[in-house]
Swiss-Prot record:
CDD domains: AAA, HLD_clamp_RFC. PANTHER family: CHROMOSOME TRANSMISSION FIDELITY FACTOR 18, REPLICATION FACTOR C SUBUNIT 1. Keywords: ATP-binding, DNA replication, Nucleotide-binding. This is Replication factor C large subunit. The gene is rfcL. InterPro entries: AAA+_ATPase, ATPase_AAA_core, P-loop_NTPase, Rep_factor-C_lsu, RFC_lid. Belongs to the activator 1 small subunits family. RfcL subfamily. Pfam families: AAA, RCF1-5-like_lid. ATP binds at residues 47-54.
């Protein structure tokens, strides 16, 4: 399943938001390549995460009709690999004569065993390049100085919340989702200028819904540096278990929510033995969460949190880098899709509970199937539906049918007839009572006099003259 961040990635530079100056510099550099050799062979696109640096590089290749090759931080970038892959790509055009753009992502993370000699190899590639090269980094000054001197920096800045909100509304329209302006603006404001994070937050809140309200938004006022996606990065790619745990301290997600995120994305990052050990840690964490629910002892959260973060990080000895397309829990999507059905179910359970003098939870767990069986019976169905005051959607849910079926519609109509008959009977009884109450005083006096005379005659003792 393609994430929305990938699905709505810009296809050309006009789609890059909030960084018009950077886009202009990119276009000018590309046109210089088209006319011959530019002043610099390589650009460094730098700025905060999620502001469109990689998207701009890919959009440039698309707009200029260039081929491209991308080497990101998830790949091993030793001197030998860079020499064998990026080297030839930067010196030779395609068979059709098109230029080839070489993109190296996370250039400020060239360190460690896997990237040994990578910076020096990239510098040699740039010096010998006859094709355009782009380096992408978050921190400009984390790139080694010889590399910086061989390139020209192009800065990307954080994107304004209004600009982000405008794009989020367009995405909602494309997905057929009606969105409250406050909900979209809340996501945009909480993103801290990170467009990718905002789109991911929108997807987590809105996927499976038809109407997005403010209360549906999963994000809340929290440190934007501690978004769920950055926490997942720390868990799966952090230096150690402690950093994985500490990344959750400012996260506004309970362990019961966080475990669903990790469970969904664990198979994306880990494989084979690591995956099995990772799920074992999640299983143990879930045991502690169960104890929290049963005992209401929230101090046990700390053990669950460590197992699902530090424990999951500890099962892997690899140091992973680069961008991973994390996805929101599929469980939440299913809950969103069944929200209306659950609402109808709970409404029916409340009516049954009130009629039977039991709790709603008991009615929901024990009586729904029983009432459904009564509704399916021709003898009792209409009477039960009328007694409980069920609407057509509740009848359909309890009988396991669609509201549009003739059987459900007839049952609902019969129940309505019973209800109307009872209402008419109640009105008749009420009218009779009112008639008695508004009877004329002289009529009452004559009636009472007549009744009194009859009573006196009945109570009078018989005499001899009666025989």
């Amino acid at each position: 399943m393609t994430s929305w961040a990938e699905k709505y990635r810009p296809k050309n530079l006009d789609g890059i938001l909030g960084n018009a100056k950077a886009v202009s510099e990119l276009r000018a550099w590309a046109m210089a390549w088209e006319k011959g050799r530019p002043e610099v062979k390589c650009l460094i696109l730098y700025g905060p995460p999620g502001v469109g640096k990689t998207s701009a590089a890919l959009a440039l290749a698309s707009e200029m009709d260039w081929d491209y090759i991308e080497l990101n931080a998830s790949d091993q970038r030793t001197a030998e690999i860079i020499k064998s892959i990026a080297g030839p790509a930067s010196q030779v055009s395609t068979f059709s004569g098109r230029r080839r753009l070489v993109i190296l992502d996370e250039a400020d993370n060239l360190h460690g065993t896997y990237d040994r000699g990578g910076a020096a190899a990239i510098l040699r590639v740039i010096k010998n390049a006859t094709q355009p090269v782009i380096l992408i980094a978050n921190e400009y000054y984390n790139i080694e100085k010889p590399l910086r001197d061989a390139c020209r920096g192009v800065q990307f800045r954080s994107i304004r919340a209004q600009t982000i909100a405008s794009l989020l509304r367009e995405i909602c329209r494309s997905e057929g989702i009606e969105c409250e302006p406050e909900a979209v603006m809340h996501i945009a404001a909480m993103s801290g200028g990170d467009l990718r994070s905002a789109i991911n937050d929108l997807e987590a809140a809105a996927r499976g819904l038809k109407h997005l309200r403010l209360e549906d938004v999963a994000t809340s006022e929290r440190d934007v540096k501690a978004s769920i996606f950055r926490v997942l990065d720390s868990i799966f790619k952090g230096e150690d278990s402690r950093s994985a745990l500490e990344a959750t301290y400012q996260l506004d997600e309970s362990p019961e929510d966080l475990i669903h995120w990790i469970d969904e994305n664990l198979p994306i990052v880990y494989k084979d033995r690591e995956l099995a050990k990772g799920f074992e840690c999640l299983s143990r964490a879930d045991i502690f969460l169960g104890r929290v629910r049963r005992r209401q002892n929230y101090t046990l959260w700390r053990y669950a949190a460590f197992l699902m973060t530090g424990g999951v990080r500890a099962v892997s000895s690899k140091v992973r880098r680069g961008y991973t397309q994390f996805r929101p829990p599929s469980l939440w999507k299913r809950l969103g899709q069944t929200r209306k059905a659950r609402s109808v179910r709970d409404s029916a359970a409340r009516k049954i509970a009130a009629h039977c003098h039991v709790s709603t939870s008991y009615a929901r767990s024990e009586l729904l199937n029983f009432v459904g069986a009564l509704l399916r019976s021709k003898k009792t169905g209409a009477a039960v539906a009328a007694s409980l005051g069920l609407n057509i959607e509740e009848i359909a849910l309890l009988t396991g049918s669609s509201p549009t079926t003739k059987k459900v519609q007839k049952l609902f109509e019969d129940a309505q007839k019973i209800i109307e008959a009872e209402q008419i009977a109640m009105i008749d009884r009420g009218l009779k009572i009112v008639d008695r109450e508004i009877e004329k005083p002289e009529d009452k006096a004559m009636k009472y006099a007549s009744v009194s005379k009859e009573i006196v005659q009945e109570k009078r003792q018989r005499s001899l003259f009666d025989f």
